[in-house]
């Protein structure tokens, strides 16, 4: 009986650590509605004042709006991403101009610890080490309970 409780405790700790990962970096993928041409790694076609504009490989921040089906793309502001993967219509805000996306596009979010920008100067190594120590401690505690 005590072994079952310890295993449940271990599973709960692992789940808590995994779900604590935050997502803010994202990549937008889509297809040109006119030519069906795709761009690698990503492409978005937006319409502003009747003109079709292509945005290829756009990275930025995702912000939830009051509408649960739309999000704001904010290139330089702080923001959070709703989840690791989602598909929705977006309202983009490059250069502080609202641009409505003409189609439903995919939003692929990257975990903050795996930022695609390659900037390692943020000092996230200490938080990663703290997370590893905490998870190792939780596993040790669960194993000790299992041995009792």
From Swiss-Prot:
Q: What's the name of the protein?
A: Ponticulin-like protein D
Query: Can you give the propeptide residue ranges?
Result: 126-148
PTMs per UniProt: The GPI-like-anchor contains a phosphoceramide group, rather than a phosphatidyl group.
- Where is this protein found? Cell membrane
One Gene Ontology cellular component: plasma membrane
Q: Which gene encodes it?
A: ponD
Its placement in the membrane is given as: Lipid-anchor; GPI-anchor
Q: Kindly state which keywords UniProt assigns to this record, in alphabetical order.
A: Cell membrane, Glycoprotein, GPI-anchor, Lipoprotein, Membrane, Signal
- The species this protein was found in: Dictyostelium discoideum (Social amoeba)
């Amino acid at each position: 009986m005590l072994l079952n409780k310890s295993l449940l405790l271990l599973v709960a700790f692992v789940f808590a650590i995994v779900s604590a990962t935050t997502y803010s970096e994202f990549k937008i993928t889509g297809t040109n509605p006119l030519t069906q041409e795709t761009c690698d790694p990503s492409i978005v076609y937006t319409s502003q004042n009747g003109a079709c504009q292509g945005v290829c490989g756009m990275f930025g921040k995702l912000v939830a709006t009051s509408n649960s089906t739309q999000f704001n793309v904010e290139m330089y502001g702080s923001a959070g991403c709703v989840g690791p993967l989602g598909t929705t219509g977006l309202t983009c805000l490059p250069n502080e101009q609202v641009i409505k996306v003409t189609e439903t596009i995919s939003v692929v979010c990257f975990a903050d610890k795996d930022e695609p920008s390659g900037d390692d100067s943020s000092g996230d190594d200490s938080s990663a080490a703290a997370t590893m120590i905490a998870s190792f401690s939780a596993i040790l505690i669960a194993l000790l309970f299992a041995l009792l």
